[in-house]
């Protein structure tokens, strides 16, 4: 398991480095990071405040309302991007937003949630509560980046599949 996870993490950072070579690559990477962060925060805030039916036994603290909150909060970075792109006339901000970006945010949120559930599943199998001790109370570093890893890998696969088909 740790070998597979190490490979996925390496693949994530290699693809992230590749993305940053593109003209707007840094903005795209920051955008993906923001979507993942807002998705995590939205799931936590809405899940804790609304509560409700549990999402799965794999991760018993996750609720359906939290998942919906993740999807909704994942759209916030669009507003942040629009705000900063209106303040700045820099070429970095020529990344165009349309309906596909909204769908992309929702897909990134879905990948983040799936990544979180997959890591939770493996933690349950290994009978481990936290993946590390560096961030007490947060489940470790891996719990902070599990969604990001799966989001970037998902985007890589979607990108390759779409360009292969078209």
Locations of regions flagged by a protein language model:
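Juxtamembrane boundary at the C-terminal end of a transmembrane helix
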Residues: 156-166
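Active-site catalytic microenvironments for nucleophilic, acid-base chemistry
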Residues: 79, 83, 125, 160
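Acidic (Asp/Glu-rich) catalytic motifs at the cytosolic membrane interface
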Residues: 36-52, 56, 64-65, 110-150
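Secondary-structure boundary/capping signal
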Residues: 25, 54, 130, 165-166
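Membrane-embedded alpha-helical bundles of polytopic integral membrane proteins
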Residues: 1-63, 67-106
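Short, conserved aromatic-histidine micro-motifs
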Residues: 90-96, 138-139, 145, 164-165
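Hydrophobic alpha-helical transmembrane segments in multi-pass membrane proteins
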Residues: 70, 74-79, 112, 148-155
